[in-house]
Amino acid sequence: MDNVLTPEWARSIENIVMSGSYKWGGKSLSMSTNYYPLELPKGLKWGDWEPKSGPNYHWIKKFGHNEKDLIKSGNEWCVQLWEQLFINCNLKEHFNIEEMIDCYVNVHTHGQAPHLHPDNGNFTLLYYPQLNWDYRNWGGGTTIWVPDIDGVENIEKLEILEHVSYKGNRLVMFDGWHWHRPEPVARVCKEARYVVVYKTGKDGGNSERLDYYDN
């Protein structure tokens, strides 16, 4: 869903996110496993298997698992953003989303190769805060796959369900069981790619609603 915040709110969130400090060591996959190296753009062709002793890393800042944690840590903006998304996108009415169970910001730059992975939690929300992101030349979108698989040994069964370009003030939503990944940032891009992530709990709902907010 596009333009989920007012222009003033969107600029405020962009400034807060991009002025933050982030810790190296975020993992897109927590298990040690053999894994595919970087796939070609948008996952249209697989590479060869290569041994790895753990996931690739990126920058991250974790804020907490509920509104109380966020306020206690001085990150009221995370609560305010959550409340705006909850109301503006009708998350309760359309997706039966009840509560936030995790909140953090992921940061990637060119040269990092995020892994495909599923999420914990019932539903994942990704907010793109960078309003001037050049998605046509910089990449950095999000690709989502089906069906649900048990692990990377079945990765060849996956088919692309949706590729969502990085457009500022856009919200991406999907069931947490979907294997997905942030797409690599292009070499010509000298910016870091920031994404605000909320993992949520919901009552019912199903992946067939994924196309409710087709872009």
Each PLM stretch: what is its role?
Residues M1-F95:
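Non-heme Fe(II)/2-oxoglutarate
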Residues N75, V79, E83, E93-N215:
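Catalytic core of non-heme Fe(II) oxygenases with the double-stranded beta-helix
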